Amino acid sequence: MTIEKTDAEWRDQLSDIEYRVTREAATERPFTGRYWDHWARGIYHCVCCGTPLFESSTKFDAGCGWPSYFAPINGEVIAEKTDHSHGMVRIEVQCKQCGAHLGHVFEDGPAPTGLRYCINSAALKFGD
């Protein structure tokens, strides 16, 4: 992790939902985030540090209510760790640059990877 800020700095920078999702690993409600049904062409960046994370060309409708992608923009931007919360074992996805919680990755996605990166809209900022 190369970008580190104090809790107060993150709170000043982020909205309440962005802070809860990215810094406290909360999950936004399905079908409520700004990007779950967003199909413009461009890049989805980390809301905390601006790192490019996902390209719109890898986004697909998984029917789950969260933005879903079959691959990150490259292998250097995402960190994965085992998450034992809520009585489940899942793989948490974090921004490698700032440690922001993004969501989880599952092995039920489409070709070519077979992966579904299920990401909270509050963890993302869309742009070019």
Swiss-Prot record:
Gene3D superfamilies documented for this protein: Peptide methionine sulfoxide reductase (2.170.150.20)
UniProt-listed InterPro entries: Met_Sox_Rdtase_MsrB, Met_Sox_Rdtase_MsrB_dom, Mss4-like_sf
GO biological process: protein repair; response to oxidative stress
The keyword Nucleotidyltransferase is annotated on this UniProt entry: no
Catalytic residues (positions): C118
One Gene Ontology cellular component: cytoplasm
One Gene Ontology molecular-function label: zinc ion binding
Transmembrane helix is among the record's keywords: no
Listed cofactors: Zn(2+)
Assigned keywords, A-Z: Metal-binding, Oxidoreductase, Zinc
Domain MsrB: 7-128
This enzyme's EC code(s): 1.8.4.12
Positions of Zn(2+) binding: C46, C49, C95, C98
Cofactor note text: Binds 1 zinc ion per subunit. The zinc ion is important for the structural integrity of the protein.
A Pfam family recorded for this sequence: SelR
NCBIfam families: peptide-methionine (R)-S-oxide reductase MsrB
Family listed: Belongs to the MsrB Met sulfoxide reductase family.
Protein name (Swiss-Prot/TrEMBL): Peptide methionine sulfoxide reductase MsrB
Organism per entry: Ralstonia nicotianae (strain ATCC BAA-1114 / GMI1000) (Ralstonia solanacearum)
